[in-house]
Amino acid sequence: MVSCTDDDDKEPNFMPPDIVMGGGDVESEYPEDLPAPGASVMYTPSLNANMYRPISVKYSSAYPPISSWKTENTRIIAYMDGYKPAIKTLKAYQESVNKYGSSTTLPKQAATGRFYTKKIDGRWWLVDPEGCLHLERSATSLRKGTSSRNKTAWNSRFGTDEKWLSTTQRELSEIGFHGTGAFCTGTYSLIQTHNASNPSSPLTLAPSFAFLSQFKSAKSYSYPGGSDDNAAGLVFYNGWSEWCESYLAGSAFADYLRDPNVLGFFSDNEINFSSNSSRILDRFLAISNSSDPAYVAAKAFMDSKGTQSVTDDLNNEFAGIVAEKYYKAVKEAVKKVDDKLLYLGTRLHGTPKYMEGVVRAAGKYCDVISINYYSRWSPELTTAIADWANWADKPFLVSEFYTKGVEDSDLNNQSGAGYSVPTQNERAYAYQHFTLGLLEAKNCIGWHWFKYQDDDGTDNSSKPANKGLYDNSYQLFPYLSFFARELNFNAYDLIQYFDK
């Protein structure tokens, strides 16, 4: 039996809860401080009439000190009526998945040597290079920490890149995470070296890029109106489509093309197609240079509508035009350079993920619509997620989500979009609650936790936050790991439960 409290290289002041995770064929044990649930009720919002006994969890969108908490009913596997986990040991899990963490028990599909998407009986899936159905469960930002204690811990625990990545791959896979997401700065090539040396235990990659800023720099353009909020307007500038093709065919992508371990790529992050306080059409019309291509496009759009008054509907339509011009150029370039490389979109966030025009454009050209999903305790199964399915016949991937514990962390937690919760316990419950909702959604093909390791030191302008699966001594958070493992190990079985 392996206990997460037994590591002698743990940070001396770190006191994890008493969590015991079974190794091999030994079953894990629930922690003694598992909260007592309420009476059995029907889970909402839901696509199914499933009953559960909720626990009450506190959370806040504020940074500490938290003066007022909200509370929300929260669903965890232990208290789901009518469901018992099918997989309770590491050995059973390893026997049920392949090297990518894909199911070896669900019906096999055509093996193409690459990842692709497929809709089967109304549910979207990823299919891995071996033809196995795959639910994506990965972590973003796999990179070395830069603080002094990060460096000391890394040298003490690993010492070499080879040991770091082989250890990390093993530890992550043993809690059901099998790959990496965006922002693995300085690590992508190291991951590929690891994969080449360890073909039976790879880490998948989903590299992220910054097409708009790279295009601006390559062409010596300025942002429309001098503001990076208007970066999307660069798609109206000369050479956008041609540059996308040359960029994809160039050195930035050379290592990823035709690599079977590359899930796909993100071309940008959180493009500002609009926000609650700033509509893209208003911004482009406010550009003082009347010859700026972004202004010209916005003015021509308004003229075609015969009005000078911007409405939300007009803004949504125009944002869709901008998004389509963006996504079309990238996708057409992908088809010419490597037509089997999945295009994962641009990690829509905030307002844009709720804009029909933007989501329709993404669905038309992206293989997967990526969503950075914050500011919601539960997935919006009957509203936004249903809209995404109606607006775009494509699957979605949650490319970021997390919570941060603020009462048992040594970080100031003054940054980040993820909710604040009191402790690591609530982080664990939130993980299961949110991902259970995602598993109900037949258009969801997985998620990327943000992120691999906590911030530290000067990260985020010296406002580091508890975002990681790992702490700053390169140790997994035991409580979060336990509950993530239970969910991840049973993800395929839970899909069958929800789809029955």
Question: In which residue ranges do the predicted regions lie?
Answer:
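Active-site-adjacent substrate/metal-binding segments within catalytic domains
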Residues: N50-P199, Q214-G264, S309, D313-N316, ...
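Aromatic- and acidic-residue-enriched segments that line the glycan-binding/catalytic groove
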Residues: Q192-D229, P260-L263, S267-S304, G457-N472
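Polysaccharide-binding and catalytic clefts of secreted carbohydrate-active enzymes
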Residues: P129, D228-V235, R258-G357
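Bacterial Sec-dependent N-terminal signal peptides
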Residues: V2-L34
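Active-site clefts of carbohydrate-active enzymes
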Residues: S217-G233, V310-D312, G350, M355, ...
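Substrate-binding cleft of secreted/luminal carbohydrate-active enzymes
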Residues: L47, G181, P260-G264, D268-E270, ...
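Glycoside hydrolase catalytic-domain groove-lining segments
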Residues: E317-E332, K336-G416, L436
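Aromatic-rich peripheral "rim/lid" segments of glycoside hydrolase catalytic domains that contact
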Residues: D282-S291, F450-K500
